């Protein structure tokens, strides 16, 4: 209990103090940026909000481009489009309350389209939890049905670790979005960098791709051979498995129309 009370007291005061210039300490927002950079993210799509301001400071320091749009739905769709076109992790960052709810349609689209995007959302401070604070909503509960992974982060020491975990889930098995809620005081708080858990990039992500069921492949071949006017509809899995060149050769060899 004493440890919990001390942590809450620390987050409350750390939000108000001027940020340190000591290279041996790091804020939660800067840990977000470091973790995103380790995941290969070079751009975030966002609409500026007070709950997430320290993430922007971290992104500037890490050389991550900030695309500030006029509505969070645009930011979510942009992150989705970025992921589809590049094959990399798309990232949308929203403030608490309406910032999160405005992004729901874009995240739901990514979920149904199997697009790997990471949605990072702000939240009111832990010290104001369940007190009806500014723009306080149950974001995790709302995002759970339309994401593969949805969680809150309640410790600055775990920020980078949780960002990496959420990013991993975007690419684990069937691709899709993840949601991570980070309270304002967790982002603002500074800790010794030695206490932060920062996973090494690429050391934990699955790289194994399973092959299709041979029986299904045989069935598909029979359908194509016997079809009078065949056409092929290619899904997101073609991009996810990096099989686009094979798909192109396939439809060209059969000389049939294809749609992606």
Positions of predicted regions on the chain:
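N-terminal alpha/beta PP-like core and its mobile active-site loop of ThDP/TPP-dependent enzymes
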Residues: 2-260
